[in-house]
Amino acid sequence: MSWFRWDGDDLILECHLQPAARSDDFCGLHGDRLKIRLTAPPVEGKANAYLMGFLAKAFGVSKSQVSLLSGELNRQKRVRIGAPKKLPDLPGLCRP
């Protein structure tokens, strides 16, 4: 299983989130998921909201084009990015 797949023009990411980190960044793979470190704390949905903004900026879309499909209360998350305008330099990530 890959950490990403395309669904039409949308990108689906399988992520492993590390909240309350020292920096915000993509830091490679964690098993079959993309590991993302965020400075936001894991309380009251703050890390999830911060993740949406982080991904929107990284993929060149608005926050409304990023949605959490699963993993609201878990570090393992599935996220949909609607028609990304740019692709960050991540292992194996390319357009279909």
Curated annotation (Swiss-Prot):
Under what name is this protein listed? UPF0235 protein Pfl01_5322
**What InterPro entries does the record point to?**
DUF167, YggU-like_sf
**What Pfam families does the record point to?**
DUF167 (PF02594)
Q: Any signal peptide, and if so, which residues?
A: none
Give the organism, scientific name. Answer: Pseudomonas fluorescens (strain Pf0-1)
Membership in a protein family: Belongs to the UPF0235 family.
Sorted alphabetically, the Gene Ontology cellular component annotations on this record are: cytoplasm
The family database entries (SUPFAM superfamilies) matched by this protein are listed as: YggU-like
